[in-house]
Amino acid sequence: MASYKGLIVDVNGRSHENNLAHRTREIDRERLIVRRGQPFSITLQCSDSLPPKHHLELVLHLGKRDEVVIKVQKEHGARDKWWFNQQGAQDEILLTLHSPANAVIGHYRLAVLVMSPDGHIVERADKISFHMLFNPWCRDDMVYLPDESKLQEYVMNEDGVIYMGTWDYIRSIPWNYGQFEDYVMDICFEVLDNSPAALKNSEMDIEHRSDPVYVGRTITAMVNSNGDRGVLTGRWEEPYTDGVAPYRWTGSVPILQQWSKAGVRPVKYGQCWVFAAVACTVLRCLGIPTRPITNFASAHDVDGNLSVDFLLNERLESLDSRQRSDSSWNFHCWVESWMSREDLPEGNDGWQVLDPTPQELSDGEFCCGPCPVAAIKEGNLGVKYDAPFVFAEVNADTIYWIVQKDGQRRKITEDHASVGKNISTKSVYGNHREDVTLHYKYPEGSQKEREVYKKAGRRVTEPSNEIAEQGRLQLSIKHAQPVFGTDFDVIVEVKNEGGRDAHAQLTMLAMAVTYNSLRRGECQRKTISVTVPAHKAHKEVMRLHYDDYVRCVSEHHLIRVKALLDAPGENGPIMTVANIPLSTPELLVQVPGKAVVWEPLTAYVSFTNPLPVPLKGGVFTLEGAGLLSATQIHVNGAVAPSGKVSVKLSFSPMRTGVRKLLVDFDSDRLKDVKGVTTVVVHKKYRSLITGLHTD
């Protein structure tokens, strides 16, 4: 809203009705925010009618220094052009602007020019501005998604669930994306403005912002701070004392705010799910349908040979001292964004992998994607971007080698089906898990899978050979789902399927690791000789006590058990590996009473210490989109074993609708304890003489 002397008295951006029509009212009700490919209207208040033969012209400016100038046509022209029409000619003129579906996203400044018959500018009103976003509701937009329920989840939902753990023990954590929180949109454009391409040539960068492929790739590179002014610094092991430990974050908004307020200095620290969640926030805010993905048993194939090779000594200790070596992560998170790929052959539209975790350089930057999920499934590794790396993450072989004292290597196990399991995302229809593994690859062992492997250059093994190689001795690891703080048993079973007794040496090793396989210390080791009668099984129990693992367990509460069976006269040693996550209890979060916007409400959080030792330095962190910004409550004193701690916090909800309140608890000995509850915030009613009125 702005006032001018002369003919144009006032310009009204009609933000209330425009933002409602463009589904941007959650972002801001006062500033004008529109989506491309969809018309919007502004009103001119004039002191008089336009003089005879005078007319209006509209000019758009983009960039901090007006690097891009667009003249708006008076009548409907080409589909890729801006145009406007006007109604009324007295003291009020309604201007309706039509943007092309491939318009540049960004902050526009609009100048309204009153032109004389001879082409001179009589008056100029240029104080109105607006933001333009992608429009997944527009059929001609590259991000068009023709499913309203998916749009509500992948664009409009500010809360979500991210999956973690191991493929056979999947856990979830709540996350506050908060893409419509105050000034988050401004920070998202600030992220784009600080990319290397924008700093090098802002005009060219702005013009490319019409393309979601370009924007998605830019955001992927900018979410991590490797080599640029990116948002987050990654760190995968303690200490985190000069920043925030990755597991303590419960939402993206504090991260983005801290980055912006600190003068675009990177925030410490993130790991893969934090990188993915922040990218999801930015991309949803800009209007690109996006969802977080978790790939369990995710391969990091450094040398591109489609296999992950592990070198061990005879004590089962890793020998790979290379700075950059193959690894297998218990889980790895990235995002998928929905868009058409006009830069690629037909068949590559739809979900695209974007991975902001800094792992490998791509065109000189730490980014990955966008890579079509369809291309990964079909083994088309020549398409842009980074298809071989993504294909390996979900399809690589896993090979373990024993390096003997004389330097000779012995292959002890080769697994063609252990990577890329239970690929997961939150369902559109609730907080349960949707398995999308079959989006990435054909069923294990199918003919189609073997055809894809052959096309991608991965060695194909026929199923019959797999069975023949198993031999007469079989090795497996069994365990319950243990709770962190308790003692538990791991059972290693040796089965003898042959017709004679087997004599072997069994080595068992339990070690603490991080979720991305960094070793934190040995918990227990056991080597014994076993005799297994024909057609029988032998079970060996390794009991792990809390004192065995607490001194070295990581914040991910993960124990890796390896078992190696070496039987003279057999085909060779066999090995199996199990990753055992130690579960932690959830927080109890309650918000009693009716929630009404801008009226006080109290949240109650309680927690019982499950450990046999006191907890010191306890901190609760609460946040929720539309409810309250991230707030910490420190616990006074220690929490005794089996002791209960309770805290409460009063706040006033800021926005109506179904909201999530997220809580995290951390202490010296127990970290990453989460809780969540749903809060339905109602509109505020007040009684007037004429009846009821809704705020």
Swiss-Prot record:
Keywords: Acyltransferase, Calcium, Cell membrane, Chromosome, Cytoplasm, Extracellular matrix, GTP-binding, Hydrolase, Membrane, Metal-binding, Mitochondrion, Nucleotide-binding, Nucleus, Protease, Secreted, Transferase. Gene3D superfamilies: Immunoglobulins, Transglutaminase-like. It catalyses: L-glutaminyl-[protein] + L-lysyl-[protein] = [protein]-L-lysyl-N(6)-5-L-glutamyl-[protein] + NH4(+); L-glutaminyl-[protein] + serotonin = 5-serotonyl-L-glutamyl-[protein] + NH4(+); L-glutaminyl-[protein] + dopamine = 5-dopaminyl-L-glutamyl-[protein] + NH4(+); L-glutaminyl-[protein] + histamine = 5-histaminyl-L-glutamyl-[protein] + NH4(+). SUPFAM superfamilies: Cysteine proteinases, E set domains, Transglutaminase, two C-terminal domains. Its EC number is 2.3.2.13, 3.4.-.-, 3.5.1.44, 2.3.1.-. GTP binds at residues 476-482, 578-581. Its cofactor is Ca(2+). GO terms for molecular function: calcium ion binding; GTP binding; histone dopaminyltransferase activity; histone serotonyltransferase activity; peptidase activity; peptide histaminyltransferase activity; peptide noradrenalinyltransferase activity; protein-glutamine gamma-glutamyltransferase activity. It is found in: Cytoplasm, Cytosol; Nucleus; Chromosome; Secreted, Extracellular space, Extracellular matrix. GO terms for cellular component: chromatin; cytosol; extracellular region; mitochondrion; nucleus; plasma membrane. It comes from the Eukaryota. Monomer. Calcium-dependent acyltransferase that catalyzes the formation of covalent bonds between peptide-bound glutamine and various primary amines, such as gamma-amino group of peptide-bound lysine, or mono- and polyamines, thereby producing cross-linked or aminated proteins, respectively. Involved in many biological processes, such as bone development, angiogenesis, wound healing, cellular differentiation, chromatin modification and apoptosis. This is Protein-glutamine gamma-glutamyltransferase 2. It comes from Pagrus major (Red sea bream). The gene is tgm2.
